[in-house]
Amino acid sequence: MIKNRKLDITSTNVAGIGTDLDKKCRLDAASTEAQWKGVGQAPGLKIWRIENFKVVPVPESSYGKFYDGDSYIILHTFKEGNSLKHDIHFFLGTFTTQDEAGTAAYKTVELDDFLGGAPIQYRQCQSYESPSFLSLFPKYFILSGGVESGFNHVKPTEYKPRLLHISGDKNAKVAEVPLATSSLNSGDCFLLDAGLTIYQFNGSKSSPQEKNKAAEVARAIDAERKGLPKVEVFCETDSDIPAEFWKLLGGKGAIAAKHETAPTKSEKVLYKLSDASGSLKFSEVSRGKINKSSLKSEDVFIIDLGNEIYTWIGSKSSPNEKKTAFSHATQYLVNNKRCEYTPIVRVLENGTNQSFETLLSA
């Protein structure tokens, strides 16, 4: 069965503590998750997909390829000075199930504990990925389907055509979109993968980076099929676009204009979550430049950077402050009519790294 119900991120219990899902995960994990054995000991990437409440390793050959019906955990181990640091991302596809999303979040906490509680945790939602996440993958694909779809490999001659959308300059993204002329636009590049023929459509206002990325993806698909496909490249303004290209899209039609979005710089806002008074209170601390000295060990702080939300967990904060930090961050997005899929990052006081310090001072 192919999942097609969009994930309601606001109803996902990310902490999962005390729920039936929590119990299910604990039983499945037993005392130690076998997949965590030996991880985080050397620089590099490890990726797991959630399958029936279990974490299943993704082959390295498939790194950077994600399905919109699944949830994943990504561990990035890197050197900072003479020590190893860890970032843990849990990625939620648009059509992943609530159980898969909850399991990914729960297992992320488990992996964090296994690595000593110091890693920085990131919640990544499809189409709203952070630059730090996208930078991990030279090739980044979002494809339709998921573990319930079977992932059956088919021969090129039996291949069901699909349309891939390539957009963005610095960190170009590749995502599968509906196979229709209405999916095209002048500002981006597209690949129509028909099995033995791969059509590259370059929008009239697409960037050189997008064209290069599209060509790179076409070459990767061609190599995967041992050089059998023929690759045809053309621009929106060409007069000799193959008739078969339009036929596969349901017929020739008007191409949408390039979608321009003006860059916006949001004012940083620092909030404090504290129960020092006897009851849990969420209050604004400051706006504009945020000094690290404003972050106190006794409390939890939520930092709104516009395109990302950070929860900073003080080393002496109370159990209740720690437990509710994520839910306050998600509720903050809802209350302020912000996109609920905005990346949320969890940072422990003793687990901060240079990238976090840079964000504060920027």
From Swiss-Prot:
GO biological process annotation, one example: actin polymerization or depolymerization
Signal peptide: none
Keywords: Actin capping, Actin-binding, Calcium, Repeat
Positions annotated as Gelsolin-like repeat: 53-102, 172-212, 280-323
Keyword Nucleotide-binding: no
MF terms (GO), sorted A to Z: actin filament binding; actin filament severing activity; actin monomer binding; calcium ion binding; calcium-dependent protein binding; phosphatidylinositol-4,5-bisphosphate binding
One GO term describing the cellular component: cytoplasm
Pfam families found in the cross-reference section: Gelsolin
Top-level division of the source organism's lineage: Eukaryota
Binding residues for a 1,2-diacyl-sn-glycero-3-phospho-(1D-myo-inositol-4,5-bisphosphate): 162-170
Family: Belongs to the villin/gelsolin family.
More details: Severin changes its conformation upon binding of Ca(2+) and then interacts with F-actin.
Role: Severin blocks the ends of F-actin and causes the fragmentation and depolymerization of actin filaments in a Ca(2+) dependent manner.
Descriptive protein name: Severin
Protein source organism: Dictyostelium discoideum (Social amoeba)
Gene name tied to this protein: sevA
